[in-house]
Amino acid sequence: ASFSVVGDIMGTSMQNLHQLLQMPFGCGEQNM
């Protein structure tokens, strides 16, 4: 159970980081 919970937390954190990385780069390209 603990392993599945950790996996879910890691999965959500990775997705959030991916979205956060896409946002600044997209805005940076528009600004450039």
From Swiss-Prot:
Q: Where is this cross-link: Isoglutamyl cysteine thioester (Cys-Gln)?
A: 27-30
Q: Where in the cell is it found?
A: Secreted
GO cellular-component terms in the record? extracellular space
One Pfam family named in its UniProt record: TED_complement
Is Zinc among the key words of this record?
Answer: no
Which keywords does UniProt give here?
Answer: Bait region, Disulfide bond, Protease inhibitor, Secreted, Serine protease inhibitor, Thioester bond
Q: Which GO terms describe its molecular function?
A: serine-type endopeptidase inhibitor activity
**Tagged with keyword Secreted:** yes
Q: What is its main location?
A: secreted
> Which family does the record claim for this protein?
Belongs to the protease inhibitor I39 (alpha-2-macroglobulin) family.
Described by its record, this protein's role is as follows:
Is able to inhibit all four classes of proteinases by a unique 'trapping' mechanism. This protein has a peptide stretch, called the 'bait region' which contains specific cleavage sites for different proteinases. When a proteinase cleaves the bait region, a conformational change is induced in the protein which traps the proteinase. The entrapped enzyme remains active against low molecular weight substrates (activity against high molecular weight substrates is greatly reduced).
Indicate the quaternary assembly.
Homotetramer, which consists of two pairs of disulfide-linked chains.
What protein does this entry describe?
A: Ovostatin
